[in-house]
Amino acid sequence: MRLLFICSQNKWRSLTAERLFDDHPHYEVRSAGTEPGARVRVAAGHLGWAETIFVMERRHADRLREKFAAELRGKTVVTLRIPDKYPFGDERLIALLREKLAAHLPLL
């Protein structure tokens, strides 16, 4: 299954989520950010590639819908409601990601 994680800058939350799946046998994972200065800025190709898209906040889903409505048709978009207060790799962020993703990704 192909998963895409989205936050604002693709430096802390979405990148941490992507790293959780390094070498996972059942998931291919990428991450991107919605803002112009993002490490990797989300593009139509990311959305076309992904089967399921996880956004950290509602504003990320809103931005994707504004910019990529056609590419999102038929896609599952899940809002995780994880605030922008955790640095990359933070243990609390990892625990929160695991907790929120467990309902959506049974093989995590």
Predicted regions and their residues:
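Short polar/charged helix/loop
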Residues: 1-108
